[in-house]
Amino acid sequence: MASTVREAFDAFAPRMRRRPDVEAHDLVAADASDRLILESAGLDRPESAREMRPSRAFGHPKQHIPEAPTATSHVGSVVVVGDRYGALALPLAAAGFRVLVHQDALSGERAARLNAVAVGLAQASDVDSIVVPGVTWHPLDGDLFAGATLVLMQLPRSLGALDEIAGLIANHADPAVHVVAGGRVKHMTPAMNGALARYFATVTADRGVGKSRVLRASDPRARVEPSAERPGPSGRRARPGALTWPRTEHDEATGLTICAHGAAFAGAGVDIGTRLLLSVLDQAPDASRVIDLGCGTGVLAVSYARAHPDARVIATDQSVAAVASATATAMANGVAAGSGSAPHSPLSGPPGVTAVRDDALGAQSDASADLILLNPPFHSGAAVTARIAPRLFADAARVLRPGGELWCVWNSHLRYRPQLEASVGTTRQIVRDPKFTVTASVR
């Protein structure tokens, strides 16, 4: 076991990978922001030296923030949120800390478990069965932060996600909690300070180091008691804290009530690509076994289920927030069949929408679906990449029965049609506008 967090990070980082997420020479599993977050927590420093450096409000470089002590003395456990591939949690565990970690993406959680094996912290096993001593994965809810005195966080891309996380910390952590949240400077904005300041009286920004920077938050504002409990991203009833999540909006064009947790793509709205696919969804086959792959808030799944009440629709996404959002959206529109991490087969289960967490279609049987709906993502974390869609096309081809169809909307400049032809089968264009194309591919 490493004697310090820094030593563990330096030893582990070169051996860590992103798999099963997209891998490439320009995409890394651990970077300077991970290192800075760990160093800024002060866990390796003697207690007498644990104090905040002079810092400046992000976006206001002339404002001087006085020094203040951190809360890292005698810390035995650390809460980690947004760890991408284990670069935060694993060094902490190696240095002897107990770590509670929440990772929204299933690919990131699996990568962290595999990386624990690679660096010698865990024994090889089926990926979801790998046990990492000292590390416990947890849903994003009040229990994750209950009594916490130190929270480390990779800043999320979405301000909504940051708002939801900050609210839960402020309402459930120890009043003396300190939050150290970091990222690459190019992905940070002054609005992140504002999101934290809604819930914490003290928010500061350290000087940038290696193109990375950390924000610090402390002194939670007074707790606000909710008027009613709402489902949290885990699907369980939320304790006070997620006071404004999920957010709900009514979309006039579709007639849908859309529910969204903070990290859900497009929030409680409908992105323009999905809206184009919705405009021609009535031309899709009348199918009994349907999958909305990469479902987000479940708009496609719910729309199809409303038009086809006897259909069994699986809404699948690797994001915890997306699955919780899709479940809430299905319930709000009266078409929910169930939810959870163990999906029904499209061949069984009740009619309606079942939202499940899965990496692509890994849990689905070969030749089991009649119709798959897909709006493929092109972001892996903060990175823009076209490498995600081909894997989804291949998985869709495996899961579709002969004669089944993949209806896909994609940015026209990406020119996915040849890949769809090669992976799935004969592909025809359904509609195209200046930005997006909708195609149907027959298996």
Positions of PLM-derived features:
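Class I SAM-dependent methyltransferase Rossmann-like catalytic core
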Residues: 2-44, 262-267
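SAM-dependent Rossmann-like transferase core, predominantly class I methyltransferases
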Residues: 27-31, 36-40, 210-289
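Conserved SAM/SAH-binding loop
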Residues: 139-143, 356-362, 435
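C-terminal catalytic and target-recognition region of SAM-dependent MTase-like enzymes
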Residues: 406-443
